[in-house]
């Protein structure tokens, strides 16, 4: 079944959510319920596109499908945080980006129809690995943004960019929820890798596995700092940045290291 129709519908709804929130932001209205509901509807439609795409492709994820799933996860975190904290302005960027991923996934047809379907455990490992990478990278980005926001709030007058950002406590809540989600998804990815991937500790994957475990510890230490001291501390932000850097090296830099260093 073609993904084009549901993909276009999801993309339209998500772009409408971003545009609606942008209009509300220009009016000085931080919260817009219509934008929020459009974001929720778009998130559900994007996940439906992923499920349908995986079914059509024998359970094998494509880059477009995994990008859509990652975008939906980040959108879900923003939407969940928006229920209690004024971070709706982030929908201006997150919703359209998720829509673009969904559009790409719906336009690019599956390429592995001739291959045997993946078993459920391997498919879960692949999906959670991609989600973990995105969530950890997102938490590291938020940690950098929070550190910059902390520094700039001490300066007067405030710059337009700082004034446009959500309040500090709302950003910290979003960061905390992102770290919790990243740690949980990374835990599932490592668990399924250890028990269901035969060559998980093989030499060609050992460096990725070690860096992923170190990133897991980084996220765990960041959460431990929160529960021990409360709030979002400087050490928590730095630890999240280190964890994100380690996982980025594991996923993006490993090939370059193997080819040019080793």
Role assignments for model-derived ranges:
Residues 224-246:
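Interfacial loop-to-transmembrane junctions
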Residues 10, 123-142:
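Alpha-helical transmembrane segments
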Residues 152-196:
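A mid-sequence, solvent-exposed acidic-amphipathic segment
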Residues 30-40, 62-68, 87-99, 236-242:
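Cytoplasmic-side transmembrane-helix entry/capping segments in multi-pass membrane proteins
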Residues 2-12, 59-71, 204-215:
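Structural signature of hydrophobic alpha-helical transmembrane segments
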Residues 82-132:
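Hydrophobic alpha-helical segments and helix pairs
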Residues 1-15, 132-136, 261:
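Hydrophobic transmembrane alpha-helical segments in integral membrane proteins
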Residues 249-262:
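Juxtamembrane boundary at the C-terminal end of a transmembrane helix
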């Amino acid at each position: 079944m073609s993904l084009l129709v549901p993909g276009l519908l999801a993309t339209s709804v998500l772009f409408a959510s971003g545009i609606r929130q942008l209009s509300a932001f220009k009016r000085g209205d931080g919260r817009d319920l219509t934008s929020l509901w459009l974001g929720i509807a778009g998130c559900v439609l994007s996940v439906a596109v992923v499920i349908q795409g995986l079914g059509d492709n024998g359970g094998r994820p494509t880059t477009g499908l995994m990008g859509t799933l990652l975008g939906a996860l980040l959108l879900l975190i923003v939407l969940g945080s928006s229920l209690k904290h004024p971070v709706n302005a982030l929908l201006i960027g997150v919703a359209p980006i998720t829509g673009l991923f969904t559009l790409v996934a719906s336009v690019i047809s599956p390429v592995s129809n001739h291959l045997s379907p993946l078993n459920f455990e391997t498919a879960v490992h692949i999906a959670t690995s991609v989600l973990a990478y995105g969530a950890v990278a997102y938490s590291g980005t938020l940690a950098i943004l929070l550190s910059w926001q902390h520094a700039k709030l001490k300066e007067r007058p405030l710059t337009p960019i700082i004034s446009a950002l959500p309040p500090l406590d709302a950003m910290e809540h979003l960061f905390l929820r992102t770290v919790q989600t990243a740690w949980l998804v990374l835990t599932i990815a490592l668990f399924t890798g250890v028990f269901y991937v035969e060559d998980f500790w093989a030499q060609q994957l050992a460096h990725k596995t070690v860096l992923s475990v170190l990133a897991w510890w980084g996220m765990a230490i960041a959460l431990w700092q929160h529960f021990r001291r409360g709030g979002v501390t400087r050490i928590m932000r730095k630890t999240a940045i280190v964890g994100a850097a380690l996982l980025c090296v594991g996923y993006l830099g490993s090939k370059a290291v193997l080819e040019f260093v080793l």
